[in-house]
């Protein structure tokens, strides 16, 4: 997928645009699946990389809806450094139409647990394709909390912890009700229904030309 993204960039499609399309696709799924969203509480749980960036975009697209919306960053703001995720976080921080907090916030653990316990929909934007192997603390406890929730869990690109190449699912690994992956499915998502849930493949504007090197 990284090579396809690079070839997409060579065609003039920026990673920032791909992130915009990815986050918007997740927001569309939530709107179509759960509308009307009145009285629904949505928590978007974001890591500090580009998977988190997809979550920031998703939150922006959902902000105008009649749902209660929280964005939680599992890290410090200064840990978000990629050229795609950082500007999208900065937009979230300037928005008054949603609530956001990060791991540096006072009483973070208690606030996060409260958010998850009252949620109806959780969007998992913690880890993407770059994380392999067993999940360490504090992320392991975070994932367990998500899995214990009665909320509907939507994973962005893949459930956090799942190896996209081999399908290895460490304990813990997010157990999604729906996984929205982008452009094409990934080998590790196949045959893992108890982790992946319903699998949706969403286009993000990468043309067929990017599939092959020229």
What are these regions (language model features)?
Residues 119-214:
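YjeF_N-associated NAD(P)HX repair module
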Residues 1-122, 127, 132-137, 187:
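A cross-family phosphate/adenosyl-ligand binding-site feature
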């Amino acid at each position: 997928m990284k090579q396809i993204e690079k070839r997409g960039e060579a065609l003039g499609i920026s990673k920032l645009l791909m992130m915009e399309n990815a986050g918007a696709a997740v927001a569309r799924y939530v709107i179509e699946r759960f509308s009307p969203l009145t009285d629904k509480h949505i928590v978007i749980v974001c890591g500090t990389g580009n998977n988190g960036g997809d979550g920031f975009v998703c939150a922006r697209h959902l902000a105008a809806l009649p749902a209660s919306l929280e964005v939680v960053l599992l890290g410090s703001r200064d840990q978000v450094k990629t050229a795609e995720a950082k500007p999208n976080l900065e937009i979230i921080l300037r928005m008054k139409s949603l609530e956001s907090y990060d791991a540096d916030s006072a009483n973070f653990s208690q606030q996060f647990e409260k958010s998850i316990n009252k949620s109806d929909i959780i969007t998992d934007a913690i880890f993407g394709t770059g994380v392999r192997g067993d999940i360490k603390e504090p992320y392991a406890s975070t994932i367990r909390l998500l899995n214990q929730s009665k909320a509907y869990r939507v994973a962005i690109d893949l459930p956090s912890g799942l190896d996209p190449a081999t399908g290895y699912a460490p304990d813990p690994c997010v157990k999604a009700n729906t996984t929205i992956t982008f452009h094409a499915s990934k080998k590790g998502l196949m045959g893992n229904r108890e982790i992946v849930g319903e699998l949706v493949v969403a286009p993000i504007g990468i043309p067929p030309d990017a599939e092959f090197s020229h």
